[in-house]
Amino acid sequence: MKRHSLILLAVACALSLPSFGKGVNPPTMGWSTWNTFALNINEQVIKSQADAMVKTGLAKAGYKYVNIDDGYWDGRGEDGKLRLNTKLFPSGMRALTDYIHSLGLKAGIYSDAGDNTCGSGGVAKWGLGVGFVGHEKEDCELYFDDWNYDFIKVDYCGGNHAKLDEREQYTKISNAIKSCKKKGIVFNVCRWAYPGTWISDVADSWRTTGDIYCAWASVKSIVKENLYIQAYTGGGHYNDPDMLEIGRTLAPDEENTHMAYWCIASSPLLIGCDMTTIPEYSLNLLKNKDLIAMNQDRLGLGAPVVQREGEVYVVAKDMEKIFGKKRAVVVMNLTDEVKTINVDVNALGFTGAVLWYDCLIHADVYYGAGNYAVTIPAHGSKAFFVTGKRIEKTLYQAEEAWLKAYHELGKKRPTPQYLPNETADQGEYVGNLGYVDGMTDNYLEWRNVYSKKGGKYKMTIRYACGDQRSMNVSVNGTPVTTLTPLLSGDYLNKWNTVGVEITLKKGLNTIQLSNPAAPMPNLDCMKLTAAK
């Protein structure tokens, strides 16, 4: 079959995009049982934590959801209906949600997409067959219309056991949730890896990694796994790097990094410690009004890497208004040594004198022009609001782009990849794009290309390929040209550039690179230069 590539480009770009710049539902804030209590839960545990959320001031700070994880069932009856473990929850679930709601809070519950829950280990009878598969409609009606829960996390241990298709089953559950009388339910998918771009139409948030545990190694690993998938957060739908381990055994500097990164990345903030015994430092960090404002910002954006030196990363995002005067910036030191980095103000999108406000100490710390030297302890971070005159972004990394066919589900399913390479501009590039392993919709998009006035630009793309390749360019759904032949002489260590003139509209633009008929080059970055 012939592939009419330019027509496909236009159709693909016409599909709906996230509502960048518009107010969206913010990430979930609350608490969950699993990190501290695991399967050791009961009615009194939940009530005491709900009480503590109010008494500690966490509820006033914005934390609202009290979420029950795995372990509350007593199997499923012969009639197919779920049975509650009434020894653990003698008053019943509706009485419990009524109590939580009476405190001005919201209540969350847990299930599995498949048959058995993770906590059952596939053997404990209470957790066998209690998952959603085959019972999507009636279980949702029980959880939301009868028990009156406001949130649900849906795991996938039983989904794997039942050999289900993630997209098909999670979509079925999503539709069942939407069909309930109760509205406004928050749906969190827990597949322990980014599921694919389809998930934004199905869930409010989705886990991007395996389970967190209370150690610096876990926090660091999860941060690094999320650095280059920030394009998938947007439009009120969020990457979820898992619950918070703050208030347990992490060192203060490690807790700072944990909280600061989760906040700037617009991740859900679900406390995992015992709120009745939370240490003062951890409590104050969780209630930090500036970090919470960073997390709950009306734009709901991810925070891509704008500068990197080894394992010191600078990530940033707009606050309050796209291309406005205020940006959130977090500088993270993931190494085991004290580090100093000169933060490039131009890379942040500013020119002239700028104001640096430190979110951890709630004070202005510097006003001036030029780069700003930030010294950070091992495992630590600094979080800032930076305010000043903006300049148009001119350098867009491939690893901050949105990839239509990207997923992390494995199972020998093809996918484009974000890959490390120190010869790339910031040490990362994107490969396996174009028609590869049968993928025809395997394209790259920069969805947040901002032009203050609009007009003509020269776009210069840095690429690598060892054989002749080509790619199509489109802007805002309109085909521009096909770049061919492209050749650099090597796939990894020799980079070449190619230029093309494009026209941007005033405001936000989407630039797409694609080839539904053949493999594309590896892509490093693209630079925009306004025509004179």
What are these regions (language model features)?
Residues W262-A265, L270-G272, R308-F350, H379, ...:
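Carbohydrate-binding surface patches
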Residues L270-E337, D364, R413-D437, E445, ...:
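Glycan-recognition and catalytic regions of carbohydrate-active enzymes
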Residues L8-S16:
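Bacterial N-terminal signal peptides
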Residues K339, L348-W356, Y367-K532:
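Extracytoplasmic
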Residues G234-G235, N239-G310, G380-S381, K389-K393:
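Aromatic- and carboxylate-lined catalytic core of secreted/periplasmic carbohydrate-active enzymes
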Residues V45, Q49, M53-K163:
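Aromatic-lined carbohydrate-binding/catalytic grooves of carbohydrate-active enzymes
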Residues H135-E138, E168, S179, I185-D274:
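Glycan-recognition surfaces
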Residues P27-T33, G62-D69, K106-S111, D150-D155, ...:
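Structural recognition of the beta-strand scaffold that forms the well-ordered cores
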